[in-house]
Swiss-Prot record:
NCBIfam families: sphingomy (TIGR03395)
Pfam families xref list: Exo_endo_phos (PF03372)
Gene from which the chain derives: sph2
Compartment(s): Secreted
Protein's UniProt name: Sphingomyelinase C 2
């Protein structure tokens, strides 16, 4: 899909103008395409390296801030007094100015973020679907599937939406496409498969890295659907040469591909999807003499600018797939698989309609409960932090053809062993979607537990002074951090990230980024914008204090119960100070960058997350 729920807003007016020009003057199609592409992409070049050009205000509330300074700035234009948050005039080692710049903000929370509306700007127009007279529905009397003997050759399939959008899409930019492609191709989760189907492999550079690096294990590869009519045994459906975006689907195989066909959906879709040549890739694979037929696809996204979130369009596209299968007259003793990001929520009404239209069996579902989850996946949360998790990706077996004794779909949530960074954004996620596996029987290479939980994820910090836990503001994602939680909750959990650490299971000392586990992409930072909140810590979107250190007082790997302190750098006074739990007035129990020595109020106990990792080994079926 180009998006989940809504996707990047392309310049609709320009596209429609292009479409009109092409329709009116077909002989000028190439010239108009080149001209329009230049006009479209030129304004975005200055932002092509940005993760997201949407400005989000995440600083704490201040009625009339004067030149607020970030904790990460090297210069402070207007330096407010670092005075006592409770106006009690403590000795302030960080203060060098007796004049207060701004009145103290209300003792509340930082301001609510106000991101630009990400709703699609595309219109609701849906192209008319041409009648498909090429296909005829097969005789249902000949629809009796044949069982595959369990001793016969089996197939293992991986599907993953890799979220590699065209890099010049407004506001989306390049979220580490090349770096993620390198990490995906070197990761364990793509190994030991027979077939891989990638969706959203739109970007040319990242796709080349991905395919080239995997070519040794998967030497048989198709072109990406919708790019060209060449390199296929046949190109069917509604191929639109004026589309500016390919369809993003590509298939890799360990075994010879005997036939490959691209089919562009007759229903061109709606919203942002209309501008892509979306469809499906069909391949016939010969594994040790056994033929397998695989269809890889990426159905219409759930775009808010589509009628009923694209349900009618997806229904038409699923009909295209089924009709194509009927037209191929595939022998009944050969397996047919339908694979991809189908953009249908599992167990919804549409889901059961899809099962019927595609004429497939429901698989046995195991693994993590969702394939797209903004509660656990940082990339998904980066763009859609308020969306509920959903299951969208599937590997189905056609009912009309050979049936395995069992068919399992395993949703898995791997992360990269090493982080990647682009334009200041750092993550260890491979994509906004999680991959899924389709297989008959599990084997020793089958993942049996979540790959997402790391040792220093969801840790808590208990104050040695008051026995309470530091927590993010339960009511505001960018609220103040306070050591006031009596028990551990979702809001007292934080993820520790130490970039460049080759052994992420052992953090001793050094620079860290501390992220709220409850509010992904919100990091510890301190406020310097005037008022009593100066040097108070809060959760800031995609902006961690870049000089925050964790110090283990025992100088060993951090373990449960380790005694620690935090140190950070004051960009104004150019000195380091320890974080402390404030103990007076209205700002009691707030976290501050304040002390130049260590006492009980600067000491915390690290609590590792004791929740067992999600394990589904008992749900798997082995031979």
């Amino acid at each position: 899909m180009i998006n989940k729920i809504t996707k990047p807003k392309l310049l609709i007016g320009y596209y429609l103008l292009l479409f009109s020009l092409i329709r009116c003057l077909p002989e000028k199609e190439s010239s108009y395409k080149d001209l329009f592409t230049s006009l479209l992409f030129l304004p975005n070049q200055t932002n092509s390296n940005q993760v997201n050009s949407v400005s989000i205000n995440n600083d704490p509330a201040n009625p009339n801030p004067v030149n607020p300074a970030s904790a990460n700035n090297n210069q402070v234009n207007a330096v407010p007094e670092n005075d006592d948050p409770a106006n009690l005039n403590p000795v302030n080692p960080a203060s060098a100015n007796s004049n207060q710049v701004n009145a103290a903000p209300e003792n509340g929370s930082p301001a609510d973020p106000n991101p630009a509306n990400l709703a699609s700007a595309n219109n609701n127009q849906v192209n008319a679907v041409p009648a498909n007279n090429y296909f005829t529905k097969e005789d249902s009397s000949n629809n009796i599937p044949k069982k595959v003997n369990s001793k016969n050759v089996e197939i293992k399939v991986l599907s993953h939406n890799v979220f590699m959008l065209p890099t010049n899409l407004p506001r989306w930019g390049n979220l580490g496409h090349d770096e993620r492609a390198k990490r995906i191709s070197k990761s364990d989760y793509v190994k030991n498969q027979d077939v891989i189907v990638f969706e959203e492999a739109f970007d040319t550079s990242a796709r080349k890295i991905l395919l080239d690096n995997l070519r040794e294990e998967y030497p048989y590869q198709t072109d990406v659907v919708g790019r060209t009519k060449k390199n296929w045994d046949a190109s069917l459906g509604n191929f639109r040469s004026y589309s500016l975006v390919n369809g993003g689907v590509v298939i890799l195989s360990k075994w010879p591909i005997e036939e490959k066909i691209q089919y562009i959906f007759n229903d061109s879709g709606c919203g942002a999807d209309w501008f892509a040549n979306k469809g499906f890739v069909y391949v016939k694979i010969n594994k040790e003499g056994k033929k397998f037929h695989v269809i890889g696809t990426h159905a219409q996204s759930q775009d808010q600018n589509c009628s009923n979130l694209g349900i009618p369009n997806r229904a038409n596209q699923f009909d295209d797939i089924r009709n194509f299968i009927y037209s191929k007259n595939i022998p009944k003793d050969e397996t047919v698989l339908i694979v991809g990001d189908l953009n249908v929520i599992k167990e919804s009404n549409e889901y059961y309609d899809m099962i019927s239209r595609l004429n497939v069996n429901e698989p046995r579902y195991v693994g993590v409960p969702f394939t797209w989850d903004a509660k656990t996946n940082e990339i998904a949360a980066y763009y859609y932090e308020n969306e509920e998790p959903v299951y969208l990706d599937y590997i189905f077996v056609s009912k009309s053809h050979a049936q395995p004794p069992v068919w399992q779909n395993l949703a898995y949530d791997p992360v990269s062993k090493q982080t990647w960074t682009v334009s200041g954004y750092t993550s260890d996620e491979f994509s906004d979607h999680y991959p899924i596996y389709g297989f008959v029987y599990a084997d020793p290479s089958t993942p049996t537990k979540s790959g997402h939980k790391k040792k220093y994820d969801q840790v808590s910090f208990q104050s040695a002074a008051n026995g309470k836990y530091i927590q993010a503001d339960p009511n505001r994602k960018n609220g103040w951090l306070k050591a006031d939680a009596v028990i551990e909750t979702d809001f007292t959990k934080f993820n520790l990230l130490q970039e460049g650490n080759l052994n992420p299971s052992c953090i001793k000392n050094g620079l860290v980024r501390i992220e709220s586990s409850r509010f992904l992409n919100y990091f510890w930072n301190w406020w310097l914008g005037g008022g009593s909140g100066n040097y108070g810590y809060y959760s800031k979107f995609n902006d961690a204090s870049n000089q925050l250190e964790i110090i283990n007082l025992s100088d060993e790997c951090l373990e449960n119960g380790s005694k620690i302190v935090f140190k950070d750098y004051d960009t104004y006074s150019r000195n380091h100070y320890y974080l402390t739990v404030w103990d007076k007035g209205n700002w009691n129990e707030h976290l501050y960058l304040w002390k130049d020595s260590i006492s009980q109020r600067e000491i915390f106990y690290l609590k590792l997350n004791s929740t067992p990792v999600r394990n589904w080994s008992a749900d798997l079926i082995y031979r």
